[in-house]
Amino acid sequence: MRVYAAITLVLVANTAYIGVEAWGGLFNRFSPEMLSNLGYGGHGSYMNRPGLLQEGYDGIYGEGAEPTEEPCYERKCMYNDHCCPGSICMNFNGVTGTCVSDFGMTQGELCRRDSDCETGLMCAEMSGHEECAMSSECDISRGLCCQLQRRHRQAPRKVCSYFKDPLVCIGPVATDQIKSVIQYTSGEKRITGQGNRLFKRMPFA
């Protein structure tokens, strides 16, 4: 009789243990799968996925965010095989030459000097509302920096735009290099120069 009671007790305890494990699995409040997009747990964090604001993040902020040198630009060569695809080896004097672009850069491509561009194009800083990746690509002397622009029913994009606060810019911005003040049209001057004239007209003010 004691043997049956002991076996029954072991079976009840075993089923109770399995039941508790199952209930805990159903009603566990924290699950890393539910919060994987916030970086909790090992099921994929926000750093593994390129999000909207994390594009091009190199792990550095502020200083040292200058663009890295391209390994193919002006590389020393002897044959075209030593250059990257889209480049050819030009021997100007002697045996060794330098790798240059096969075709000139078109509008919107990054260049370093005027000779990199196609005929009729000049290499210049980006003007306003052109797409960018970092503020160093925009013309800071005109007061432009790279900003994330969101518009209704459009995908967000990074463009060179005028700024007042350097905190809205992507990447470091040297505000002391701004040479020109933003020029407003006459209508904008009139609207912004009024100040609080509306409140002065009110009879109760």
UniProtKB/Swiss-Prot annotation:
UniProt entry tagged with the keyword Secreted: yes
Coiled coil: none
GO BP of this protein: neuropeptide signaling pathway
Cellular component GO terms, alphabetical: extracellular region
Signal peptide segment: 1-15
Tissue/organ expression: Expressed throughout the nervous system (at protein level).
Keywords for this protein: Cleavage on pair of basic residues, Neuropeptide, Secreted, Signal
Protein name according to UniProt: ITG-like peptide
Organism: Camponotus floridanus (Florida carpenter ant)
